Structure formats: structure tokens, C-alpha cells
């Protein structure tokens, strides 16, 4: 939403899920009337309502190893808003291969983390976290819970990373892993 409000010209969104009532406490881009609707369509409608001059392109698909390179090729900056380790490593690996800058973020309960990768300017996600943790070593967001405001805080910071990169202003979180606790 903040990218649309900032006037970022073209925004791509990939997700195969539909809006569920359980999403609404943390995904405020959707509302109760969107339950059952494709998440990408709901998000597009909200962003276009905020700024009708923004072009929102939707991809109703899960991102996988077969689709990711085609999905990211036309974008200047990639934002990882996923909630699982395999997807985070896939996005990292594709962006490193394609020499695409991206913002990683992760949240759980009251905590979040964020880092930005720019080719040639700092470590990537896999450089910091060599491999995904063993299965069941870390609870999923569904198991542990997520406080909706945490997603808002970290998502806003990711939007600012994208805006700073696009405008070429300020210092990005390259070479840093920002951790944040709301407690």
C-alpha cells in the first residue's frame, strides 16, 4: 500500500491464495468483503484505490523454481513478503542469479527482521543464513502466531528500502540485518 501511495510506477504481486478471514488481522490490504477473493485481485483493487496512476500487475501463482525468473525479470527491486524458508531462499537465489536487488523480511510473534541485498554491495540472505533450519526447528507463523502490527512495521520498512533504492537516496540496509522487537 505504501508503494502505491508513494507513486511507484509499476508493482507486481504474486500469490495463488484467496483471502481468508484469518488473514485480516495482519494483512490489512484486504477487508471482510474480500474474503474468498484472490489475494492478488484484492491487493490490486486496494492499491489502485489509493493511487489510480499506479500500474499493478498480478500473478495468481505460487512462486516456484520454474516461474521465479520470469516473474522478477521486469522489476527493478524485489520485495520478499513470504512466510516460509524455502520461498525466502528461492527468492534470494533467483535475485542473486539475476543480479536483482531485493528486501528480505521475516516476522514471528512480536519480532521481525529485515535486510536488503544489492548486487556487489553486501551479503545476500544465503550468505547470512547458509541453509534453511531443519524441519520443525523453528515454528511456523501459523504455529507461533504473528502480531499484525509487526507485519505493518516491517512491511513499511521494506517499502522505504524500495523507495530509497529507486530514488538513489539514503542508506540501505545492505550489510546489516535489522532486528526489531515490539516488546
Residue ranges with predicted function:
Residues 1-183:
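Adenine nucleotide-associated cytosolic modules
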Amino acid at each position: 500500500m505504501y508503494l502505491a501511495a508513494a507513486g511507484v510506477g509499476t508493482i507486481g504481486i504474486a500469490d495463488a491464495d484467496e483471502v481468508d478471514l484469518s488473514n485480516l488481522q495482519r494483512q490489512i490490504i484486504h477487508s471482510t468483503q474480500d474474503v474468498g477473493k484472490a489475494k492478488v485481485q484484492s491487493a490490486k483493487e486496494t492499491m489502485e484505490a489509493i493511487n489510480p496512476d499506479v500500474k499493478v500487475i498480478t500473478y495468481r501463482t505460487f512462486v516456484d523454481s520454474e516461474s521465479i525468473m520470469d516473474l522478477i525479470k521486469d522489476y527493478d527491486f524485489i520485495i520478499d513478503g513470504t512466510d516460509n524458508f524455502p520461498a525466502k531462499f528461492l527468492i534470494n537465489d533467483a535475485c542473486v542469479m539475476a543480479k536483482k536487488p531485493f528486501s528480505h523480511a521475516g516476522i514471528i510473534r512480536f519480532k521481525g527482521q529485515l535486510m536488503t541485498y544489492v548486487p556487489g554491495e553486501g551479503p545476500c540472505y544465503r550468505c547470512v543464513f547458509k541453509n534453511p533450519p531443519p524441519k520443525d526447528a523453528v515454528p511456523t507463523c501459523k504455529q507461533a502466531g504473528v502480531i499484525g502490527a509487526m507485519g505493518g512495521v516491517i512491511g513499511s520498512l521494506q517499502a522505504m528500502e524500495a523507495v530509497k533504492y529507486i530514488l538513489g537516496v539514503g542508506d540501505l540496509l545492505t550489510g546489516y540485518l535489522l532486528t526489531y522487537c515490539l516488546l
